[in-house]
Amino acid sequence: EVTEFANLENTGITIDENPVLKYKDPMGNEFHFVRTYKPVCHDYPYYLPIMNKYYSDFDMAGLVTWHEGQNAPDKVLTVHSTGDVDSGNFGAAEPAYIRNLLLAMEKNRAEAGLDSFRVVTEATHWSGMMYNGGHPELIPEYKVPIIDIEIGSTTESWSDGAAAKAMAKSLFSIFKGDGKKLYSILCVGGVHFEPAFVNAVLQTEGDKAFAISHIIPNQWLVSGKYEEPEGMEKLKKCVETINGGIKGIAFHDGLKGMYKDQMRTLAKEYNIPAFKHQLLRRPNDIAWIE
């Protein structure tokens, strides 16, 4: 669908017997489009060397694919950062670009009249674990910020041409910010498709805006034993992968006390506020440390 919005040129690179195409926008931003045999995370040992060979110096990488899963919501345009929360292996993340993409997806969804679709974020994860695509320790070996960009979660949604076009058009806006002062936050707790975190991006008013990247849901805090000392080390590793660091930690109010305590300890370590998710609706009430 990207060919509807840009004139693509051949780069001279071939991956999986497919030519890699490129587009340079009026601002000089260059986009490469790579068609692969299978989703990259399904065979990381194969694709990681290719990514590092051709795209180790790029600013952002996006894996455009479909979303599915048991009890997964349908008619969604979704974005998530990469990482295996249980083991504490996180990919690089760029909050500003994720925010730009989410805003563009919401704008294009509305303009296309896709009233039955919603823009959502998912908890940080890596589908390589599900598809035996490699060991999670491979994730940090790709240093470029990387996200999954998906349409879900049924064949009807996957074949929806208007949704595909809205998503494709959004890709070209990933470097286009709106000039607001951004507050990058680590999001912790809640469910896999936690609405509080994406709403913080889509519904922020005024000159202060939230940017999100890694989202650690309640279920993987528990299975990853994040209440233990090793859990704190995993949290620090997570923060260190976020470009520009973080300005605060938003935790879901439903978290158990021991996890809230961990977030407050982590916040003290970085000299930033930790706050309940309800405050995401009132950014001016947060005790930011400028």
Show which residues each predicted segment covers.
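Acidic, Ser/Thr-rich peripheral helices and adjacent loops at domain boundaries
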Residues: 201-219
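N-terminal catalytic or cofactor-binding beta/alpha core of small enzyme domains
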Residues: 1-143, 154-155, 161-165, 169-197, ...
